[in-house]
Swiss-Prot record:
Similarity-based family: Belongs to the universal ribosomal protein uS7 family.
UniProt keyword annotations, A-Z: Ribonucleoprotein, Ribosomal protein, RNA-binding, rRNA-binding, tRNA-binding
Quaternary structure annotation from Swiss-Prot or TrEMBL: Part of the 30S ribosomal subunit. Contacts proteins S9 and S11.
Pfam families cross-referenced by the UniProt entry: Ribosomal_S7
Job description of the protein: One of the primary rRNA binding proteins, it binds directly to 16S rRNA where it nucleates assembly of the head domain of the 30S subunit. Is located at the subunit interface close to the decoding center, probably blocks exit of the E-site tRNA.
Tagged with keyword Ribonucleoprotein: yes
Organism of provenance: Vibrio atlanticus (strain LGP32)
PROSITE patterns: RIBOSOMAL_S7
Gene3D superfamilies tied to this protein: Ribosomal protein S7 domain (1.10.455.10)
Name of the protein in its database record: Small ribosomal subunit protein uS7
C-alpha cells in the first residue's frame, strides 16, 4: 500500500451519445477483447429496443433497471479462530453500480434471445420491472447477508 497519498478513482469520460458516465461504464463492462465500438452498438441498439417496448425514455429505463439490481449489502469472508464466517457488510456506492452492471451483463449473456442487444434489452426491461435473473441475484445476496446477520459484529 502506498504511504504517501490515496490514489483517487479514475474519471471516466461520459458516453458520446447520451452524455452519461454510467452508460459509458456499462459499455466498458460489456466490452469483450477491447472492441468498444461493437459494445457501443449493442448497448445503443438495446436502449432503442427498450425505449420502443416500454414507451419510456432510453436512460430512464436503464437507470431504473440498475436501481432495482443494486445491492445494499453483501457478505465477505472473515477468518476468526480457525473458522470462516460470512460477514455482512454495506456495499460502497461505486461498487454497487459495478456489481449491478456486471450482474445485468452476466444475466443477459445467459438468456436465449437471438442477438446480444435483444438479450440485454430483455434483461434490462425485466430488471426495471423487478424481475429477471439479475434481480434474483441481488435478492440472493441480500438473503445471504440477512441469514448471516449474527456475524455482523465481526465487521472490519
Amino acid at each position: 500500500m502506498p504511504r504517501r497519498r490515496v490514489i483517487g478513482q479514475r474519471k471516466i469520460l461520459p458516453d458520446p451519445k447520451f452524455k452519461s458516465e454510467l452508460l459509458a461504464k456499462f459499455v466498458n463492462i460489456l466490452m469483450v477483447d477491447g472492441k468498444k465500438s461493437t459494445a457501443e452498438k449493442i448497448v445503443y441498439t438495446a436502449l432503442e429496443v427498450m425505449a420502443e417496448k416500454s414507451g419510456k425514455d432510453h436512460l430512464a429505463v436503464f437507470e431504473e433497471a440498475l436501481e432495482n439490481v443494486r445491492p445494499a449489502v453483501e457478505v465477505k469472508s472473515r477468518r476468526v479462530g480457525g473458522s470462516t464466517y460470512q460477514v455482512p457488510v454495506e456495499v460502497r456506492p461505486v461498487r454497487r453500480n459495478a456489481l449491478a452492471m456486471r450482474w445485468v451483463v452476466e444475466a443477459a449473456r445467459k438468456r436465449g434471445e437471438k442477438s446480444m442487444a435483444q438479450r440485454l434489452a430483455a434483461e434490462m426491461l425485466d430488471a426495471s420491472e423487478n424481475k429477471g435473473t439479475s434481480v434474483k441475484k441481488r435478492e440472493d445476496v441480500h438473503r445471504m447477508a440477512d441469514a448471516n446477520k449474527a456475524f455482523a459484529h465481526y465487521r472490519w
